[in-house]
């Protein structure tokens, strides 16, 4: 039972790190990346649909995204959705594809993005710590019910703490990498 609690905690922590990585993909770091458009939803015949389900997105150059809609009639709606998103990008279309030129970031914008990276990082760490707390509470219940001994409880909480430390170290490494990418000129 205690091993199960630890396994569940590990899986939840892994998911928290994955969610954090996905959040960071949406932060524009001055170079093109299909993940930038992940959160853009298009009003497609009255249904909010993610843009990556309506078009193929490619990165032919470092600062250019090309969006090729499967349905050409949706181009105008896609343009509206991109303009409405807070990406700060201006689409240009030639009737069959939408091109997004990614301008170089200003120093001020870089600092804002670095702050945002730190905020996401802190949120992810809080999520991991909450998972640790929940796992430790579960283990304490098991000890209280007599399913594990006090020594086993200590051993298992140490294991949960090690998991927490590992995941927080992962988050720190990812954060450092993304901050470096954002601050790069």
From Swiss-Prot:
Cellular component terms per the entry's GO annotation: cytoplasm
Broad class of where this protein is predominantly found: cytoplasm
Pfam families assigned: RRF
Cellular compartments annotated: Cytoplasm
Keyword Amino-acid biosynthesis annotated: no
Signal peptide range in chain numbering: none
GO molecular function: ribosomal large subunit binding
Keyword Cytoplasm in annotation: yes
Keywords noted in UniProt: Cytoplasm, Protein biosynthesis
The protein's role, per its UniProt record: Responsible for the release of ribosomes from messenger RNA at the termination of protein biosynthesis. May increase the efficiency of translation by recycling ribosomes from one round of translation to another.
Record family assignment: Belongs to the RRF family.
Protein name: Ribosome-recycling factor
Organism annotation: Geobacillus kaustophilus (strain HTA426)
Highest classification ranks of the organism: Bacteria, Bacillati, Bacillota, Bacilli, Bacillales
Name of the gene: frr
